[in-house]
């Protein structure tokens, strides 16, 4: 009984952490929408969850993730304390098909939860959504301390 109670408490704590975080979130606005990441001489840590933050999978460059049904969501996070992209020759961009609305904070790609308000490096989110014609809504850009060309495209 004690093991069951402990497991329940651990699951409850994990759910609280997932709901408290402000993850970058992609929501399908039509069936079969997809997203992926293209890395140009760059390899940031990016993970996604399709089950509300219970399990996380690394988002590898060139891999497309399908949001099968309208309303399906993907949470995104990363551990990139020195910045997501580096400069005009070393950066990563999302790629999308279908129709996808973004919400939450891009800062979850930096600190894993979307709490930091400081852009850690120049060019941090350079070209992040360049060419994403499928993006119907932009995410929150909450940083209050910016750096050179941090949101440039």
Name the predicted role of every residue range.
Residues 125, 151-153:
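Intrinsic low-complexity tandem-repeat regions in disordered proteins
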Residues 26, 61-66, 74, 86-122, ...:
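Structural signature of tandem-repeat unit edges
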Residues 47-50:
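Conserved Ser/Thr-centered positions that define the repeating blades of beta-propeller domains
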Residues 18-40:
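Boundary/junction segments of secreted and surface-exposed precursor proteins
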Residues 56-60:
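Short beta-strand segments within Ig-like beta-sandwich modules, predominantly Fibronectin type-III
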Residues 33-35, 65-82:
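Noncatalytic modules at the cell exterior or secretory-pathway interfaces
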Residues 37-42, 77-80, 113:
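Structural motif
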Residues 1-21:
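Sec-dependent, cleavable N-terminal signal peptides
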């Amino acid at each position: 009984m004690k093991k069951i109670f402990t497991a329940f408490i651990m699951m409850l704590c994990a759910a609280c952490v997932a709901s408290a975080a402000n993850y970058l979130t992609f929501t399908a606005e039509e069936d079969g929408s997809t997203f992926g990441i293209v890395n140009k001489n760059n390899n940031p840590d990016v993970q996604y969850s399709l089950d509300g933050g219970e399990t996380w999978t690394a988002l590898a460059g060139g891999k497309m993730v399908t949001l099968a049904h309208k309303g399906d969501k993907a949470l995104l996070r990363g551990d990139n304390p020195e910045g997501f992209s580096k400069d005009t020759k070393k950066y990563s961009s999302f790629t999308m098909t279908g129709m996808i609305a973004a919400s939450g904070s891009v800062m979850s790609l930096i600190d894993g939860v979307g709490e930091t308000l400081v852009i850690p490096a120049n060019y941090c989110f350079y070209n992040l959504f360049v060419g994403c014609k499928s993006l119907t809504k932009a995410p929150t850009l909450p940083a209050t301390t910016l750096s050179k060309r941090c949101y440039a495209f």
